[in-house]
Regions:
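Glycine-rich cofactor/substrate-binding loops
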Residues: 13, 31-204
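Catalytic cores of enzymes that engage adenine nucleotides and/or redox cofactors via long glycine-rich
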Residues: 1-44
Length: 204
């Protein structure tokens, strides 16, 4: 799943991140400009092989009577192959993550290209609680503003359209600042990273 996300984020039109690209490495034999995420692609492909092995293991469950050995031949293939594949995939995944290139300006550009639409859920909650209108009416207001933003972003982003709405005059600028603050999505980031296991510190 992580490698698939990296592949998606490395697309040319976004280029938010890139897996490590070694000097002299070729991304394509025919197109010298390409920097394909070959490691992430390889890991995604091997994950399909592992999925097939897992299916084989499930077929090994029903055995005849006390126990036959129909599972044995399959296990002799899937067990050593699976463990070797998992180790290889983990090592390559660690290499990709440790050397991942993050293009912050491209990330900001992609976020800005949404014209504030990614904050629609937060806007809905604020409109419902601060404007003292029903959730159904709040949803209709935010949705209409969002659809208009999709169609004509040059005439105003989502925030500008909501601030102009007559029914939302009770919502202050400070409230809108909080709604459209991208840092709000990082509120729990320390806790998320805290759940990631870290290798033990080697003894001196």
């Amino acid at each position: 799943r992580l490698m698939q996300e990296i592949r998606l984020l490395q697309r040319t039109e976004g280029r938010e991140v890139e897996e490590p690209f070694q000097k002299g490495q070729k991304g394509s034999s025919a197109m010298p400009h390409k920097r394909n995420p070959i490691l992430a692609e390889r890991i995604c492909g091997l994950a399909r092989v592992l999925s097939g092995y897992a299916s084989t293991a499930e077929y090994n469950i029903p055995l005849w009577h006390e126990r036959d050995i129909s599972h044995s031949g399959a296990e002799r293939v899937i067990l050593p192959d699976s463990t070797a594949l998992v180790e290889y995939m983990l090592l390559k995944s660690a290499f990709v993550v440790e050397n991942l290139q993050v293009h912050e300006k491209n990330c900001e550009r992609v976020l800005e290209s949404t014209h504030g639409l990614l904050f629609s859920s937060r806007a809905l909650l604020t409109v419902t609680s601060s404007a003292k209108i029903s959730r159904e009416d709040a949803y209709a207001i935010v949705q209409q503003a969002a659809m208009e933003t999709w169609a004509n972003p040059e005439q105003g982003n989502l925030r500008q359209r909501l601030e102009r709405h007559a029914s939302l005059s009770a919502i202050s600028k400070a409230d809108w600042d909080q709604v459209f603050d991208a840092r709000s999505f990082l509120t729990h980031i320390d806790g998320i990273f805290g759940r990631v296991p870290h290798p033990p510190t080697p003894s001196p």
